[in-house]
Regions:
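Conserved small/polar residues in nucleotide/adenosyl-binding loops
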Residues: 293-295
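Conserved structural position within tetratricopeptide repeats
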Residues: 3-6, 62, 117, 162-165, ...
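Post-signal peptide N-terminal segment of secreted/secretory-pathway proteins
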Residues: 2-107
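Short coil/turn linking the two alpha-helices of tandem helical-hairpin repeats
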Residues: 26-35, 123, 185, 251-253, ...
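TPR alpha-solenoid repeat register
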Residues: 16, 124-125, 139, 173, ...
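Residue-level recognition of tetratricopeptide repeat
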Residues: 11-13, 122, 170, 204, ...
Length: 295
């Protein structure tokens, strides 16, 4: 069958890919039969046959959707093949997890990515998996993690948005996506993802700290201050936001304002070591400036 994939007479024929998918389906069924009978079976063969079957049946469906010479679409494959893919999808998760745990992240990514992408296969459109599959955000997060392990920034950017609603991994997926944009040199997308991260995950300091640091280091202190004020309006006792506002005043040499906000940060967290250290530094700098005035 492999030769038929490249043969000019057969490679664009839906039957070719249907047969290829059926072969993988039979491999899968044979291994699962052994498992049911408590005989030795190859778990990776089960998982890889599920992956290949999905790939081949999707290609079959794509070709079968092309109109014939009369302009009509007669896709006899869709119903049975979509049912087979739906039944196989859980093994895409299992295969991805097994390869991920073996630190074979390139292979893991293929499984997780296929699971996520299958939710938008036209042949499964009636199932509305993007809305109904409650595991989708979690598996998109796994795909993002595997992509990060292999350094595939484009894959991170592709799968992370679907992971943002995952309860446990959403904020980290957002962080990886921001890092990926930064690594690719797309500053506009990086800044946008940091801003989105602040709004989606206000309890995560990463996004706010990186955004303020960017504004501050690029001589946009007023933008940083504006953002700090906006965040404090929503959470006036947040120690990080108070500290950042103090730090901005500190850099602007507005020492009295800096002292005020460092003290507010300390009031919010009496063990905030950085705030104690910096308020002491500001007092010292203020004293030095005053001594220079009197010389």
């Amino acid at each position: 069958i492999n030769g038929a994939f490249t043969n000019s007479e057969t490679k664009d024929n839906a039957d070719t890919w249907d047969v290829a998918g059926f072969i993988q389906k039979r491999i899968n069924e044979k291994e699962m039969e052994s498992a049911y009978l408590r005989k030795p079976y190859d778990t990776l063969k089960v998982y890889n046959s599920a992956l290949n079957m999905c790939k081949y049946y999707f290609k079959c469906d794509e070709l079968a959707q092309k109109p014939n010479e009369k302009g009509k679409i007669k896709n006899k494959y869709r119903k049975p093949n979509s049912a087979a893919i739906l039944a196989a999808r859980p093994n895409l998760i299992n295969g991805g997890i097994q390869y991920f745990n073996l630190d074979k992240n390139k292979e893991a990514l293929k499984f997780f990515a296929t699971y996520v992408e299958s939710a938008s296969y036209p042949m499964l459109a009636d199932k509305e998996l993007a809305k109904n599959d409650t595991l989708l955000p979690q598996i998109a997060y796994y795909a993002t993690l595997a992509a990060d392990r292999v350094g595939d920034k484009d894959a991170i950017i592709k799968y992370a948005p679907m992971a943002l609603s995952d309860k446990d991994g959403g904020k980290f997926a957002m962080q990886l996506m921001a890092d990926a944009y930064k690594a690719k040199g797309d500053t506009a997308a990086w800044i946008k993802s940091l801003e989105e991260g602040i709004l989606k995950f206000p309890g995560n300091d990463y996004f706010f700290a990186n955004l303020v640091d960017y504004y501050n280091s690029s001589n946009q202190a007023s933008k940083a201050m504006e953002f700090a004020d906006r965040m404090l309006a929503n959470d006036p006792n947040n120690k990080l936001y108070l500290y950042v506002k103090a730090y901005l005043y500190h850099n602007m040499k507005e020492y009295d304002n800096a002292i005020e906000y460092y003290k507010k940060a300390i009031a919010a967290d009496p063990e905030y070591a950085e705030a104690y250290s910096n308020v002491g530094l500001v007092y010292l700098m203020k004293a030095q400036d005053l001594s220079l005035i009197h010389i």
